[in-house]
């Protein structure tokens, strides 16, 4: 949220003219048609519209509810925040600024709160990364019993993002958390899009 605010990704619902589709969905489920319209505009495609919930694929390729459009922690009753336009670029800029000002080579993760299919509750995941490979591949390594791991890839950026949320919290007004001790922070090809499963590998699309 802090990155979206800093980059001005805030929308005034008073300036939004809802489409026919937005009005129909809003009427059926007692939603604000302007908010629905913003969600549709931030979406590449609608995955599911049911029970008052909009599950979409965002322009970034993320599958989530409401395209990440959020009214929480945004001043004003008529304003909502959007996801950063390019979270990876935002992370790279922050990383570069930190290196220039502090002389430190750091990894940067921009996170947001997502729900999870078949699991109750939300958790933070990485939507933008810089300097850190978001996936940690153990394939080919052996476990303590000598078994060679064939398919074992950890979403390390998501794990760090989720751990950081325990520190930052939802109501504490702490926008940044520092994770120390992770050694791999010089991966220049980092992108959070590598965390998105390709459609050809997805059994549920």
Q: What are the functions of these language-model segments?
A:
Residues 1-22:
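N-terminal low-complexity or amphipathic/hydrophobic leaders
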Residues 3, 20-78, 102, 106-205:
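A structural signal for small-residue-enriched, beta-sheet-centric alpha/beta enzyme cores
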Residues 82-106:
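Phosphate-interacting basic helix/loop segments used at nucleotide- and nucleic-acid interfaces
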